[in-house]
Amino acid sequence: MERVWWKEAVVYQIYPRSFYDSNGDGIGDIRGIIAKLDYLKELGVDVVWLSPVYKSPNDDNGYDISDYRDIMDEFGTMADWKTMLEEMHKRGIKLVMDLVVNHTSDEHPWFIESRKSKDNPYRDYYIWRPGKNGKEPNNWESVFSGSAWEYDEMTGEYYLHLFSKKQPDLNWENPKVRREVYEMMKFWLDKGVDGFRMDVINMISKVPELPDGEPQSGKKYASGSRYYMNGPRVHEFLQEMNREVLSKYDIMTVGETPGVTPKEGILYTDPSRRELNMVFQFEHMDLDSGPGGKWDIRPWSLADLKKTMTKWQKELEGKGWNSLYLNNHDQPRAVSRFGDDGKYRVESAKMLATFLHMMQGTPYIYQGEEIGMTNVRFPSIEDYRDIETLNMYKERVEEYGEDPQEVMEKIYYKGRDNARTPMQWDDSENAGFTAGTPWIPVNPNYKEINVKAALEDPNSVFHYYKKLIQLRKQHDIIVYGTYDLILEDDPYIYRYTRTLGNEQLIVITNFSEKTPVFRLPDHIIYKTKELLISNYDVDEAEELKEIRLRPWEARVYKIRLP
């Protein structure tokens, strides 16, 4: 068993705009993060993944970067950033920065030059094409709705933007672009950064011919994802990046890779291939999406969740490494999506944490998850800020004539602003996030759900997360044990084991408010048992043979095999 620090770590994601505002302008900032580092130390996390703080016009909340080597004014200064890094390192917390290199902002100096003329030295830093028959070069749809192409009058050509029109895609076929990216990465690593989370990194290689996507009935544009996800040169580029940059530092890397299968996941994460340490796969995040994509909402089933999680656990075992997550800045709140955010909010938040943190992989906690923050239902589209949500609403209501209330229901369930409402620190005005007017409204349930209340209550979701993190430090089996699913067909109970030598964890989670009976399979015989954690009071003497589970109950036993 080779010990690796990033396998043993727990990562906490900070979305800086919504974390804590130190100066009253309504926007979270770097000094706000510094002010709350003792809170993260108390929770026990090892790594912070910081969403982008680079200079940006903020079209997509910092994922549109105009200067990779400077800090956004709203967030502070480079001096603030250095102080934050020092204060994190003092507390034994590492810093992973967001690396956004599929695209830049259209206000980046490279793009400003690129659009000036067809023979500008920066022209082929981006993907420019002439139109076809007076229309876009192909029929690709942007992830944020509408065409993925924008016409530019200056040279009479179109540029590709898989995201917003203010996020032109970089041309990774150009070795100069790659060199610029690697130099920028070294700039941050030499300042002491401990790794990168790489935004949509599996989209950097496009099929050079940029063919049309499969047309969708009733839609003007088509998905071109098969021509830009896991493209022809993506592994070549990542191996080059590893050779030139990553291999020279002791860091952790995680790639965001929508649409990746376990077989592809291994190509990115098998250590012998020298690319990335782990990826964020999306299969479990797509279980409630139909063929029409994210906004085509379907009920998810526990059977599908078991199948998906088990597939990733088993297929990467001994080859790659999993990232474990249910929440991030792009997803709705897990307790509202997979649990019960009403009567059983606390129980189901703890159950979901148990289910996730006991699997093999590196767990990620998104800010507010550790206190059981929930989705929000703002009354009006005017209360929303996310470009993806606003573009989708406009397209569906204005162009397709859909019922505005039905579109709002989709946003309430799946919108990214569910994750972006301000962190709920206490029950004072604006949840203690800001002394000013918050950039996005606060979830009205902050009076009940907040950090202050969580710290004071020994049975809170926070203290449960803290215990899960401590257990990870005490038991190698949680990090390195192999995973096996038991009870594949049970509609309510997700039960699996982890095994290392003659030790085994039995993880029992009830994904319902029903009270199903758990029975220990006859083939499991043990010498001793110990209850490691549970979200209800449990009689330690209770036999494992047959247990009636309570709503959203979770238990983890450690047994010694004969």
Curated annotation (Swiss-Prot):
NCBIfam families: PRK10933.1. It is an enzyme of class 3 (hydrolase). The record marks 330 as: Transition state stabilizer. This is Oligo-1,6-glucosidase. GO terms for molecular function: alpha-amylase activity; metal ion binding; oligo-1,6-glucosidase activity. Belongs to the glycosyl hydrolase 13 family. InterPro entries: Glyco_hydro_13_cat_dom, Glyco_hydro_b, Glycoside_hydrolase_SF, O16G_dom_2, SusG-like_C. Its main location: cytoplasm. Ca(2+) binds at residues 21, 23, 25, 29. The active site is at 199 (nucleophile), 256 (proton donor). Keywords: Calcium, Cytoplasm, Glycosidase, Hydrolase, Metal-binding. It is found in: Cytoplasm. Its EC number is 3.2.1.10. It holds the Pfam family Alpha-amylase. One of its GO terms (cellular component) is cytoplasm. It catalyses: Hydrolysis of (1->6)-alpha-D-glucosidic linkages in some oligosaccharides produced from starch and glycogen by alpha-amylase, and in isomaltose. Extremely thermostable. It comes from Parageobacillus thermoglucosidasius. GO terms for biological process: oligosaccharide catabolic process. The lineage of its organism: Bacteria, Bacillati, Bacillota, Bacilli, Bacillales.
